[in-house]
Amino acid sequence: MAYQEKITEFKNWATNLGCPPTALPTDDALRRIFKSGSSLLLNQLQSRIQPVDYVREVRENLLIAQVARYKDKMVPLASRSFQPPELQRYQKIQELKKHKEKANQQLTEARKEYQKLSAGIKTKNIQTISAENRKQLLESKCNILDLKLESLNKNYDQELKNKIQILGTTPVKLSARNASEAQATRAVEQALKQLETFYGMCDDGNAVNNLAEAKQRLWDQMRSTFADIPNSLLLNVVMKIKEEQLQHIMKLNESRGECTNDKPPLNNYEVKLLKTKADMLGLAAKYFAAQKELELKEERFCQDYSVFVDKLQSKVYRFNGISLGDEENADELISDYLVQYNMRNFNRSQNEFLREQIEQLRLELDAGAKQLENHDLKLGSVKQVYGDINSSINRIQQDMVQLSQIKEKILFSRNMMKNLLDDMQAATQKQNAKSQLMSTKLKVSNMSMLGAESFCLANDSVFSSTKVEFDGNCSAINSTMRRSFDNKTLVPGGAASTTLMAASGATLPSHLLEFNTFLEIPLEKFSCTPRACSFLLSANPLIVEAQELASTVQLAPGYLLTPFGALQEVRKRILWASAIAAHTSELKLNLQPLIVDPHDLRLKASRQHEEIDQLLDNLMAIGVKTQLQLEKAERIYQFLLENPLRRYVPPSKRYNNGSFADYESEFNLYYRMTTNGSSMRAPPN
């Protein structure tokens, strides 16, 4: 039985410690343990380890016994530190209970007040929502009524305009009141003044809307001016004014025809100067237009900027939870943001502008390269033309060499003819005058025949394709023969050393003297052709009067046989020389190649990259500051969620000369003190 009592006592002790009955060993196992030598250790363990309730009760009894000694005695507060710690904790617990009751009462009162305020806010929200809905309904009705009123006003205005137009288009009847022509003249003069003011407004270059309004106002004034005047009187006055204007124009034309002081024509410098002035005026007009546009954009920017800053400030306040007291910090933050944002936009636009400038310069370089290639091609073509000219010059020189050889042959035949003539003159000196005259005719004919024979002996393949008839040449040569009255002989023009006939005391017949007399008169005197035609058809004196034979004259080109053709050829040569000079001057390129320094561009790009990196660093700093503000806002939000009042109490608001943080720290202190003392027994209620 003794072992059974020990077993039951052990089971009670284990269950008091909190051990479940299923985890206890069986009775046989416990009996074997008690029978063995380890029963003493088990008894010591049971005596040393007691349940928590038993230990707490013992401690409370000891505390009650200690408190009983101080019963009905005065215990000063200063001597609390000399009291036992259990008593100190007990007194603190009592004080904390009182504070807890007060806090609970305050919490209940605050909850009731909060519930009342929330109910009032809900009712007010319902009332405001209903009022807003009613306001929107009334505004919609007002808008509908405004639209209807506007449409009615438009219809009314249109009807008034139609009425005025009908009255204005109705022709005026002629009556005794409006039959005076002076009244019509005054109306026309007034209308002309109104037109002058309107055209002056058009010349000033006002806006299109102002011009439209001025045009409408002009038509209204015209209708009011001609309202009481018939069309017939207006037509008579207008025709009289037109007649006066025509008379004035005719007088001006007569005076202009009489005056001869015309202005001298402008030279190239004055024309270029006027063009430059016109370009300067155009640039000035563009500058003033750009300045006006800049002023308009500045006004628009100021308007939009103020609205943008207000919206941004409200968003920053709402996002960061900034109160009105921290307005300076918010303004500083907004100004920093605006400066950074504007700098970033400015740098982006500057980079885009530089990129466009680089592309434009690259295109200009490509265009310059293409232009250089085109000029190279033109130079090649010009060189080819010059090569053709050189080859033609060489060919002409070869032809001239051949012509010099032909000239030698002609001189040889001429000398041979001179010898033949001398022999014939020596044989005919002994004849009489009549036979001399006959012999003279024969000699002249023989001379022409010999010239023709010598001409035929030459190689015809080397002569020019332009040939003059031999009879014409002979007549031209005969027309240049002149009379020598000293020795009574006939001498060819330009060949004084050659004598066709020796007079030697012989007398010429009268008809031959008359022939020699008329021979000196030019051919133009005997023809019916005018001087201009003779200039075009007569022979060139530079060729005819030269001491050359007919065969030599035939070698000259056809355009040199007349003075007109020679002048035309000279003009052609002058034009050709001026064209070549102009072409050579055009070949001189005035291109100034565009120089792009890649080193400067790299330096500029590096500087811009550094500025961009600095801006990115500033943006990162702003992002970090924003993240800190977000974390602060998140902490405030978590605090609001954990706060039982569900609202933020600012530090400036105090209660009994203490802030909310002081009360919170004191409450946390008491709460830790109560929760850390796990072995303390809570006092009964």
Swiss-Prot record:
Primary location group: cytoplasm
GO terms of molecular function: protein-macromolecule adaptor activity
Keyword Ion transport (UniProt): no
Ranges in a coiled coil: 87-165, 342-379
Keywords: Cell cycle, Cell division, Centromere, Chromosome, Coiled coil, Cytoplasm, Cytoskeleton, Kinetochore, Microtubule, Mitosis
Top-rank lineage group of the source organism: Eukaryota
Function noted in UniProt: As part of the augmin complex, plays a role in centrosome-independent generation of spindle microtubules. The complex is required for mitotic spindle assembly through its involvement in localizing gamma-tubulin to spindle microtubules.
UniProt name for this protein: Augmin complex subunit dgt5
Species in which this protein is naturally found: Drosophila melanogaster
Taxon lineage: Eukaryota, Metazoa, Ecdysozoa, Arthropoda, Hexapoda
Designated gene of the protein: dgt5
